[in-house]
């Protein structure tokens, strides 16, 4: 079984942490001034210390000048006890900045999971109009602050720009940057305590300030409130001297999250908590576009939920939206397929964080629990490094604290695209954790050396195949987009197909093979022509291998339908000779006739007919035609469970209705010109099957029955439900 192996590193010197000496996967810092403990209480503490030092994990912190790391960490822990952290931002993989409500700016320097330097900057303390900061934006050129009680924004501009590549300069204090402070009035409630949030685009020339909607009866001091005052989302621009409000809008529903697009810097993405006509909870994924410094809503996608949304997150490519609900359900909406997946978490999903690679997502609760899902919402077990291998569905952090401390923030340690682009092949295995009133820490994912520390989609599928969890691997492959991840999709598909072709063919594995190849041949949306041209030949090779695999297990009907789509004469001749050996004379005659037809067509055209070039658009007619299954058995189960196991999660997929943009492709050479030939083929097809109902698998792996009447162009009762090879 696949599971995540982790280590927990808490940056704390407090003795209130309850970490046993046998917890070899949990580390903290120890103070030299601590009294020695008895050997009976901590019998293995010395062995754990030797283990930590052998891995270059410091057991005690040094206090040398000028850093004085031990004293700085104690000061940071005291600050977290008395002030609220309003911003946690990773400038790079090694630099983290924390801003507290009192104006204290803390910079952390990391080396792996360990602290190297802590710089506490109090330059802004006492210089602001309020010590109740709501949110902040930190860049190399300026800082923007919003306040809870003041209807103003603070703009702090630096005369000297910090060098993004110089780590030492990044840890310098603000006083060395010669900054200038200015304040700007903004619309909205003036005498109300409101959480005003901030977001900035990747080009750093636009920003938004937003807050939750207020009720209409909250304006007793003004008889009529203007539309500008009723707005809850502001578009901000930068001038020579500071900020200006370019546009203001009022969202239709209460926003849960607002941010700029990473690929579209002038589009604002919002997630709003809405209700349907029947008062059912929903989530609206909206896109606002900035046109001539005005915000306009250009798109709204409504996602049905089981209960009210409390958290949300998007993947790095912004084509998947994950929503956590009050009933512990997790909803994942895939934009490129137009489907919705559902899973039930073992905790309250108050926090959601998606890995930068898009392979896994983490769901956390305020009670200090953590659960891992893959991008298809299959749960992945997790455990801390220990002597025994006992992975569980959730990871509990509260048991390490003698006091009640809730998990309030978690984030993968990776630089945002706003500041620098992630390097290709860069390892991302650290999850930053912040607990209310402390401590801080990281969760280190030990990914191993075979995958070079990577945690991508291909790496996840390799691990699933290694553990023979084919169902989970196929689900991840189905969630991938061939148009944007073509090479990764092909590697993943070939890995799954190769694994299945090495094993004995069963109805379950046959369905898994069809679902894997169906991600290319039967996508939910037609693939781009460039994608089809790039991968049709290598994927077609695996289709031929599947054909011979079907013949090896005497699956003549499926092999015949596959050969029809490939359109190669040698495949029909293989069926012909094998059918003769098995005594299937009717099938042998049909296959021979098909081979002769291909010969005639190739002679007339002057080239060998290799199959239709644009038959991918006909895959909705079905995939692998089980109307030709033997009597007394259905080759497809209701689900696609992995071999020897059943899926532990529930996936609900919904495809919104909409007009199809598939082109209708006429199939040639399917209708015989003479009525006598049609009757002969009807009799021969009847020898292969007597079923008129086709059971097919759609692109999402859901079983469906096709009761559509056969076209008059079909050959007798032999329903041609094809792969649609390109």
Swiss-Prot record:
Keyword Nuclease among record annotations: no
Entries under InterPro entries matching the protein: Frtz, WD40/YVTN_repeat-like_dom_sf
Gene3D superfamilies attached to this UniProt entry: YVTN repeat-like/Quinoprotein amine dehydrogenase
Keywords associated with the record: Cell membrane, Cell projection, Cilium, Cilium biogenesis/degradation, Cytoplasm, Cytoskeleton, Membrane, Repeat, WD repeat
Main location: membrane
GO MF assignments: phosphatidylinositol binding
Biased amino acid composition, Basic and acidic residues: 701-712
Locations listed in the record: Cell membrane; Cytoplasm, Cytoskeleton, Cilium axoneme; Cytoplasm, Cytoskeleton, Cilium basal body
SUPFAM superfamilies: Nucleoporin domain
Annotated segments matching region Disordered: 642-717
Any single GO BP term: respiratory system development
Ranges of compositional bias, category Acidic residues: 672-685
One Gene Ontology CC term in the entry: axoneme
UniProt feature, compositional bias: Polar residues: 642-660
WD repeats, residue ranges: 305-343, 344-383
Similarity-based family: Belongs to the WD repeat fritz family.
Quaternary structure, from the entry: Component of the CPLANE (ciliogenesis and planar polarity effectors) complex, composed of INTU, FUZ and WDPCP. Interacts with CPLANE1.
Function: Probable effector of the planar cell polarity signaling pathway which regulates the septin cytoskeleton in both ciliogenesis and collective cell movements. Together with FUZ and WDPCP proposed to function as core component of the CPLANE (ciliogenesis and planar polarity effectors) complex involved in the recruitment of peripheral IFT-A proteins to basal bodies. Binds phosphatidylinositol 3-phosphate with highest affinity, followed by phosphatidylinositol 4-phosphate and phosphatidylinositol 5-phosphate.
Protein name, UniProt field: WD repeat-containing and planar cell polarity effector protein fritz homolog
Native source species: Rattus norvegicus (Rat)
């Amino acid at each position: 079984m696949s599971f995540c192996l982790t280590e927990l590193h808490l940056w704390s010197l407090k003795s209130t942490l309850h970490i046993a000496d046998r917890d070899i996967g949990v580390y903290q810092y120890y103070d030299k001034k601590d009294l020695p403990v008895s050997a009976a209480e901590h019998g293995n503490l010395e062995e754990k210390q030797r283990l930590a030092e052998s891995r270059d994990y410091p057991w005690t912190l040094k206090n040398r000048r000028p850093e004085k790391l031990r004293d700085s960490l104690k000061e940071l822990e005291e600050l977290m006890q008395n002030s609220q952290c309003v911003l946690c931002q990773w400038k790079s993989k090694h630099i983290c900045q924390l801003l507290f409500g009192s104006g204290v700016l803390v910079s952390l320097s990391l080396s792996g999971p360990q602290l190297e330097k802590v710089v506490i900057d109090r330059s802004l303390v006492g210089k602001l109009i309020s010590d109740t900061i709501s949110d902040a934006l930190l860049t190399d050129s300026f800082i923007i602050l919003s306040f809870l009680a003041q209807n103003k924004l603070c703009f702090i501009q630096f005369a000297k720009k910090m060098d993004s590549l110089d780590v030492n300069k990044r840890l310098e204090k603000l006083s060395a940057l010669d900054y200038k402070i200015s304040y700007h009035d903004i619309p909205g409630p003036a005498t109300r305590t409101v959480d005003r949030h901030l977001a900035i685009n990747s080009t750093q020339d636009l920003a938004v300030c937003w807050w939750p909607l207020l009720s209409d009866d909250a304006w007793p001091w003004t008889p009529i409130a203007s539309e500008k005052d009723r707005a809850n989302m502001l578009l901000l621009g930068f001038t020579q001297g500071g900020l200006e409000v370019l546009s203001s809008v009022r969202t239709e529903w209460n926003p849960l999250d607002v941010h700029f697009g990473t690929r579209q810097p002038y589009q604002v993405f919002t997630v709003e908590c809405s209700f349907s006509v029947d008062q059912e909870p929903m989530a609206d994924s909206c896109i606002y576009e900035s046109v001539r410094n005005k915000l306009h809503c250009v798109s709204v996608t409504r996602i049905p939920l089981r209960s009210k949304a409390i958290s949300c997150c998007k993947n790095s490519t912004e084509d998947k939206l994950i929503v956590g609900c009050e009933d512990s359900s997790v909803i994942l909406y895939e934009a490129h397929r137009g489907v919705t997946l559902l899973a039930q978490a073992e905790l309250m999903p108050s926090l959601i964080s998606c890995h930068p690679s898009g392979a896994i997502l983490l769901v956390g609760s305020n009670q200090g629990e953590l659960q891992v899902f893959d991008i298809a919402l299959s749960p992945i077990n997790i455990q801390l490094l220990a002597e025994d291998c006992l992975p569980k569905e959730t990871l509990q952090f509260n048991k390490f604290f003698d006091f009640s401390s809730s998990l309030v923030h978690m984030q993968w340690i990776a630089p945002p695209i706003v500041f620098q682009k992630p390097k290709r092949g860069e390892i991302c295995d650290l999850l930053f954790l912040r607990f209310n009133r402390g401590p801080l820490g990281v969760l280190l994912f030990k990914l191993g050396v075979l995958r070079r520390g990577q945690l991508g989609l291909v790496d996840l599928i390799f691990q699933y195949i290694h553990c023979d969890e084919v169902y989970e691997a196929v689900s991840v492959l189905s969630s991938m987009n061939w148009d944007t991840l073509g090479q990764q999709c092909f590697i993943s598909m070939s890995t799954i197909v190769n694994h299945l072709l090495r094993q004995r063919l069963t109805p379950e594995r046959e369905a898994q093979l069809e679902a894997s190849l169906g991600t290319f041949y039967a996508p939910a949306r037609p693939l781009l022509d460039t994608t089809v041209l790039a991968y049709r030949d290598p994927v077609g090779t695996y289709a031929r291998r599947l054909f011979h695999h079907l013949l090896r297990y005497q699956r003549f009907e499926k092999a015949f339908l596959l050969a029809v789509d490939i359109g190669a004469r040698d495949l029909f001749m293989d069926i012909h000779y094998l059918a003769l050996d098995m005594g299937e004379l009717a099938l042998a005659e049909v296959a021979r006739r098909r081979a002769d037809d291909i010969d005639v067509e190739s002679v007339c055209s002057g080239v060998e007919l290799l199959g239709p070039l644009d038959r991918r658009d006909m895959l909705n007619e079905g995939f692998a035609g089980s109307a030709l299954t033997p009597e007394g058995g259905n080759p497809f189960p209701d689900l696609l469970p992995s071999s020897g196991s059943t899926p532990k999660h529930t996936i609900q997929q919904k495809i919104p209705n909409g007009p199809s943009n598939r082109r209708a492709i006429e199939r040639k050479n399917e209708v015989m010109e003479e009525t006598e030939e049609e009757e002969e083929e009807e009799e021969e097809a009847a020898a292969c099957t007597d079923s008129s109902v086709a059971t097919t698998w759609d692109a999402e792996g859901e079983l469906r029955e096709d009761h559509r009447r056969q076209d008059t162009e079909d050959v007798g009762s032999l329903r041609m439900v094809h792969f649609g090879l390109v």
